Amino acid sequence: MRVPEIYHPHPAPPYRALPHPLATIRAGISGFPSPAEDYVGRTLDLNERLVKRPSATFFMTVTGDSMVDFGIQDGDTLVVDRSIDARPGHIVVALVDGEVIVKRYEMIGKRPYLCSGNSRYTPIPVADLDCQVWGVVRSVIHEYPV
Amino acid sequence: MIGLVDCNNFYVSCERVFQPRLEGVPVGVMSNNDGCVIARSNELKALGVEMGTPAFELQQWVNQGRIHLLSSNYELYGDMSARVREVLEEFSAGVEPYSIDEMFVLFDGFDAATTRQLARTLYRNVRQFTGIPVCVGVAPTRTLAKLANRAAKKLPEYGGTCVIPADGAETRRLLERTALGDVWGVGRRLVERLALQGIETAWDLRQADPKAIRRRFSVTLERTVRELQGMPCIELNDADRPRDRIMTSRSFGRHTGDLGELQEAIRQHAQRGAEKLRRQDSLARAILVFLKTNCHRSDLPQYSPSVVVELPEPTDDSRPILAAAHQGLEAIYRRGYQFMKGGVMLFDLVDANRQQLSLLDTPERAAQRDRDHQLMAALDELNQKMGHGTVRLGMPSQNAAWHLRCAHRTPRWTTNWLELPKGAT
């Protein structure tokens, strides 16, 4: 039986760990061992670096060009963490009138706004909208064609 | 104390996390193969749509845009269920999944105020972290925790969490308001028989003499009485309970990371589960396969995955169940981990006698089903007479594709790179 492919439900363990470069740095010339030596032989795991809380982390694909000044481009993958309470300055995924949008949450004067990273779009005042934060963007993954 | 965390309208809630437009409107989830409703939002319940309603009866409402019907997306539900479990595990080492959307959480060693606070935190965090709304009931026994959970869900004054002690005015009031049929493990036939004795509410049953109940009814019901009195005596996989899901799992004799050994263990569990399914005249729609490493060995790498595989159609036939278990195991297995425990859960059960036949059903398929039925009956009889494992099925090889009808399945938002949700900038 083959139901459409099954993907690993949750990449909790390091799926593909990379070898850590050997630490060759010495602390000064005194010969005391460097703290970095404790990590010799460890491997690096991108999940561990990017996904702080797996249960609350979701990936999302970006559409549109309104966030390019914040380094978020059409087609990029966002790492969204729902366990963080949104504060001004965070890039958030918000539900606005039933749509899912990505903006920067800012306070202008004493009023909250959703701002774009593109001068062609003006800030949207939140007060007049049915708006809810879905999650906070922790990082963006941009893959280059190679 | 034992907490029960129950996800509200779980399948519909999973869909709503990624489709905010489904919020507040009637939504149903359909089984993919037999085309009937297997999950409903509150709005759909309010329209009088029952579980098991065939999709074609609702087609007109769908066309009018009054309701939304979605195909089931078990991959999504399995992933969201694992996330809920993970959030709970941040608070308690004792989390026992009871079904895909219900989990018992052990709350030991807290005073009453802390317990209440913890229940609120679980309620809030699961909702925030995963997007799934839940209710939390906490009490000294599983039966009372179930009852508290029901109160948390149905009675607005509790606001989603309800903590009750073994005794006291509040516990009494709740038990008095709970009909017998809503007590865990009390089926319809028992309700009728108990009514003849003048026992009509959970409180009446609690007041009954456990020994007399044992004589007149069963040990199982006696345990329910004691549980209602606040004395824990039901284990999670109590064999005598009628089930809405079948769990078979066990710790391995020793740690193992060998795929062959794991396959053998999962095969046994799946076959045992299928036998239990046939004994209680149920069919399953889906199977969950899980593995666990030893969480007490922090020196070893930890990995406790689970996955849900949908069965090609509701079935009690060991062969497709084994095939699905095998496929699930392959999907979650990773080398380099020492597993300590594994098992399967068969869920979304339907009554075998009330099974809706697929629209695609043909006389040939009906005849095939009869033959399958006889084969399974023969298998069970042999195993019963000659001892377990006399006749066993091997793990099937991957072959024939099954045709799934899942035209309305939503994307696998969390488990497929090509189907991630979109965020417009």
Name these PLM-found stretches:
Chain A
Residues 74, 96-101, 131-132:
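Short coil-to-beta-strand transition motifs
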Residues 113-119:
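Catalytic Cys-His active-site segments of thiol-dependent hydrolases/isopeptidases
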Residues 1-68, 99-100, 107, 122, ...:
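Short, positionally conserved secondary-structure boundary motifs
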Residues 88-102, 106-112:
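Short, compositionally biased
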Residues 79-80, 93:
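Hydrophobic beta-strand signal
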Residues 75-76, 90:
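Structural motif
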